[in-house]
From Swiss-Prot:
Listed EC numbers: 4.6.1.12
Top-level taxonomic group: Bacteria
TM region(s), chain numbering: none
A Pfam family assignment: YgbB
Organism: Kosmotoga olearia (strain ATCC BAA-1733 / DSM 21960 / TBF 19.5.1)
Family listed: Belongs to the IspF family.
HAMAP family (UniProt xref): IspF
Cofactor(s) the record lists: a divalent metal cation
Lineage, highest ranks first: Bacteria, Thermotogati, Thermotogota, Thermotogae, Kosmotogales
Catalytic activity, reaction form: 4-CDP-2-C-methyl-D-erythritol 2-phosphate = 2-C-methyl-D-erythritol 2,4-cyclic diphosphate + CMP
InterPro entries with a match to the protein in the record: MECDP_synthase (IPR003526), MECDP_synthase_CS (IPR020555), MECDP_synthase_sf (IPR036571)
Residues given in the record as a divalent metal cation binding sites: 9, 11, 44
Protein name in the entry: 2-C-methyl-D-erythritol 2,4-cyclodiphosphate synthase
Cofactor: record remark: Binds 1 divalent metal cation per subunit.
Keywords: Isoprene biosynthesis, Lyase, Metal-binding
Length: 156
């Protein structure tokens, strides 16, 4: 049986030296996203896509805005979802994503992001696609991400 899920996340950006993380990779020294955790909108969208495909709720249920998750690295969220939701139950066939951001040029970071996500999820980077878009100035000081995943239930 095949399952498909879609995820979305968006965060405002602010100019500072904390750095912006997308897909677990620092993509900017000049900006950071405003969020409860580290604000990694790409990982948040992927987590929601996986949770949607498995009918397992959403990122807010699994990782609520509480003290335990304040400033937490989103890579940890993805690792937990891999272990608790995917392991032995589902195989990731494909993840496709679109990052819409005007302030940061993403093309130089795409391969590192694909490698990082592949390593966390235990899959080939060939199963992960990341498409950056500028948004043609419509999105200003923000980052928005859409992600879709296709899973195959193990043993079917």
């Amino acid at each position: 049986m095949y399952r498909v899920g879609i995820g979305f996340d968006a965060h405002p950006l602010e100019a500072n030296k904390k750095g912006l993380y997308l897909g677990g990779v620092k993509v900017s020294e000049e900006y950071s996203s405003i969020g409860h955790s580290d604000g990694d909108a790409l990982i948040h969208a992927i987590v929601d896509a996986i949770l949607g495909a498995t009918n397992a709720g959403n990122i807010g249920i699994w990782f609520p805005e509480n003290e335990e998750n304040r400033g937490r690295r989103s890579t940890e969220f993805l690792e937990i979802i891999r272990k608790k939701i995917l392991a032995g139950k589902y195989e990731i066939l494909n993840i496709d994503s679109v990052i819409i951001i005007d302030k940061v040029r993403m093309n130089p970071h795409i391969e590192n992001i694909r490698l990082k996500l592949a390593r966390i999820l235990g899959i080939s980077k060939g199963n992960i696609n990341v498409k950056p878009k500028s948004g043609n100035t419509l999105y200003g000081n923000s980052v928005s991400v859409y992600a879709v995943c296709m899973l195959k239930k193990v043993g079917t």
